[in-house]
Amino acid sequence: MAMHILCPALVVFPILEMGTEEQKKKYLPAFGGEKYQAATSALIEPRFNFDPYSLSTTARLDGNSYVLSGEKCYIPLAADADLLLVYAAENGSSQGFIIEKGTPGLEIGEREKNMGIKALATYELSLKDCRIPRENRLGGKKGCDFNRIINRSRVALSAMAVGVARAAFEYSRDYAKERVAFGEPIAARQAIAFMLAEMAIEIDATRLMAWEAAWKLDRKEDTTKEASLLTTYADDMVVMVTDRAVQILGGHGYIRDHPVEL
């Protein structure tokens, strides 16, 4: 559910904060009301993965149009999106381009087979001389602040990690209170209690870091440092917490009847 909210948000916020007035009037109303449109962004590439400064997808100006060519992968909800925000290299800088569904040259590939997050469909995407109006360049002549877009996605994904970790912690904590071994709940065992304490500490620390980064984003401050630190810490935290949750549940942690396995 969180990813289904995040995907359109990574289109809405760049247009809201950096788009031209014409782009805001044309596209933002579609994200509310009865005529809601799905949207997603396309950054990751097969060759360079998540490297926004080495994009092989190109955009060249041709008269009153931009022509985009390249390949993207791991694009969430691409088959259902009415609007895509595609990032491409233009004269050495990374810029965003708004592409509407059905634009000639925009091709959506087969659904990828994910190991996890199976509720979120991801696809490959091809741009074959995809021609869009010149005014669909995000921000118009001014362009977009790519660092700010990346920082916002980092903060959002890290907040999701906090949510995943908290759910795993609460489930394993409640299980430890109920599971009795050798005449007492395993939560009373020091080894389990230490695990739960460390999990709680790391979750709260990450949440506070996420709040600080989000607060600075709302104030339109540079959050490159905070977002980078947060992403690194959140990644390690969520792996540790979910792993400990599986350990606390023992054999039950490997069974899908319990959500920590997922």
Model-derived regions, located:
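A short, charged helix-loop
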Residues: 64, 123-148
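A short core secondary-structure module
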Residues: 69-108
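Short glycine/proline-enriched turns and hinge-like loops at secondary-structure junctions
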Residues: 51-53, 77-81, 118-120
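Helix-loop "lid/cap" segments that line or gate small-molecule binding pockets
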Residues: 9-18
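A short, Trp-centered hydrophobic/proline-enriched beta-strand micro-motif
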Residues: 34-44
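Alpha-helical interface subdomain recognition
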Residues: 3, 18-23, 33-34, 52, ...
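Short, flexible active-site-proximal loops enriched in glycine and acidic residues
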Residues: 1-7
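Flexible, small-/acidic-enriched active-site or ligand-binding loops
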Residues: 54, 102-134
